Amino acid sequence: MALNVVILAAGKGTRMRSDLPKVLHPIAHKSMVQHVIDTAHKVGSDAIQLVYGYGADKLQASLGEQQLNWVLQAEQLGTGHAVAQASPHIADNDTVLILYGDVPLIQQSTLEALLAARPENGVAILTVNLANPMGYGRIVRTPCEGQEQGKVVGIIEQKDATAEQLLINEINTGIMAVPGKQLKAWLSRLSNNNAQGEYYLTDIIAMAHDDGVAIDTAQPQSAIEVEGANNRVQLAQLERAYQAREAEKLMLAGANLRDPSRIDIRGEVTVGMDVMIDINVIFEGKVTLGNNVTIGAGAILIDCEIADNAEIKPYSIIEGAKLGVAASAGPFARLRPGAELKQDAHIGNFVEVKKAVIGVGSKAGHLAYLGDAVIGDGVNIGAGTITCNYDGANKHLTVIEDNVFVGSDTQLVAPVTIGKGATLGAGSTITRDVGENELVITRVKQKHLTGWQRPVKIKK
């Protein structure tokens, strides 16, 4: 039996006041609908039907390379009408899981519980109890022996509910698991004879009851999982809820967050034990932190690997880089893709490293650019050093071997190799290879002009 997931994503989202389709608005740097798609994959979907409408070009530009079956809903005539558009792509023996592109926080564990709750050839509905259920469809039950809550007999929408039904606190989330054959039959029987003139997906529950089909329910761990975003205020609330959830995961995994409310996680972060993360740190992409790593305030880490005992000092940007054991970067350092700091290496303030390896114990303390370079062990890079790697057309490599001392304000014009133990005098421009243990100084001889006077400002 295949798991066929239908994701409803056709709405415009007028209240967002945006040209962007509602489901493409981001949570943690990823569109809401992408969160839902990713979760669908995690529960083992065999096929995903994406029901789209408004902003088709933008949706396809964002999601087009993924394994999705695109189903057009030309007119938005209700949730039942939306699912019906996917009917031709649903097999009789499929289990159909219905999700929503603007409900991004639904968790894998919740959907697995819902699927497990579905009776054989029956229906499972995800419900939640709210203190204030205003605006939601209510779950209608009737007393049944052996079922404390009673048997589900239908779902009534807010606008169609009686005064008595409005007192019900158990609400429909819209998420459900349904057998394919029966779903298609029920969808064909839907009517829009209701207060909103729409084809309600929820009406299939009463049909299931009338047909004698077993109906069961499951509930999420938290109500926030099933909340959607119709405007930017709600979007921000979902963002905060997502960040709080991810921060909690980090703390349970061994990280100490200085303030869990001031961290942004926009990807997948793996942490070791006794990690310390200060305030206003941003993680993007896939980030791995070893044991005893320290991350300073305001740092940004993107797709990087940080080994045990390493330190990222405040306001540094680490992207596509690797830091070895006890290496350090910052404050105000920038490591670009391809940068690698070996054990005990140090990159200081206002140093930029790109596609360069910094050897064991080597250091560049301040104000330097090191690009397209291989730097050995025990090297000292003075302030103001630049590897001149670009000739206007191509990039070239600079090699600095072990135990080299590079004086301040030195330019190394690549391609060039500096031999082991060499010393480069401050202010030198190196255009040719330097041998082992050589001292090279290229600056102009110092001149002393006696009797010289500074210009005097002319009075006007």
From Swiss-Prot:
Mg(2+) binds at residues 102, 230. Its EC number is 2.7.7.23, 2.3.1.157. Its main location: cytoplasm. It catalyses: alpha-D-glucosamine 1-phosphate + acetyl-CoA = N-acetyl-alpha-D-glucosamine 1-phosphate + CoA + H(+); N-acetyl-alpha-D-glucosamine 1-phosphate + UTP + H(+) = UDP-N-acetyl-alpha-D-glucosamine + diphosphate. Pathway: Nucleotide-sugar biosynthesis; UDP-N-acetyl-alpha-D-glucosamine biosynthesis; N-acetyl-alpha-D-glucosamine 1-phosphate from alpha-D-glucosamine 6-phosphate (route II): step 2/2; Nucleotide-sugar biosynthesis; UDP-N-acetyl-alpha-D-glucosamine biosynthesis; UDP-N-acetyl-alpha-D-glucosamine from N-acetyl-alpha-D-glucosamine 1-phosphate: step 1/1; Bacterial outer membrane biogenesis; LPS lipid A biosynthesis. Residues 233-253 are annotated as: Linker. Its cofactor is Mg(2+). UDP-N-acetyl-alpha-D-glucosamine binds at residues 8-11, 22, 73, 78-79, 100-102, 137, 157, 172, 230, 336, 354, 369, 380. Residues 1-232 are annotated as: Pyrophosphorylase. CDD domains: GT2_GlmU_N_bac, LbH_GlmU_C. Coiled coil: none annotated. The keyword Ribonucleoprotein does not apply. GO terms for biological process: cell morphogenesis; cell wall organization; lipid A biosynthetic process; peptidoglycan biosynthetic process; regulation of cell shape; UDP-N-acetylglucosamine biosynthetic process. It comes from the Bacteria. Pfam families: Hexapep (PF00132), NTP_transf_3 (PF12804). One of its GO terms (cellular component) is membrane. Keywords: Acyltransferase, Cell shape, Cell wall biogenesis/degradation, Cytoplasm, Magnesium, Metal-binding, Multifunctional enzyme, Nucleotidyltransferase, Peptidoglycan synthesis, Repeat, Transferase. It is found in: Cytoplasm. The keyword Nucleotidyltransferase applies. One of its GO terms (molecular function) is glucosamine-1-phosphate N-acetyltransferase activity. Binds 1 Mg(2+) ion per subunit. Catalyzes the last two sequential reactions in the de novo biosynthetic pathway for UDP-N-acetylglucosamine (UDP-GlcNAc). The C-terminal domain catalyzes the transfer of acetyl group from acetyl coenzyme A to glucosamine-1-phosphate (GlcN-1-P) to produce N-acetylglucosamine-1-phosphate (GlcNAc-1-P), which is converted into UDP-GlcNAc by the transfer of uridine 5-monophosphate (from uridine 5-triphosphate), a reaction catalyzed by the N-terminal domain. PANTHER family: BIFUNCTIONAL PROTEIN GLMU, NUCLEOTIDYL TRANSFERASE. This is Bifunctional protein GlmU. It comes from Shewanella baltica (strain OS223). The gene is glmU.
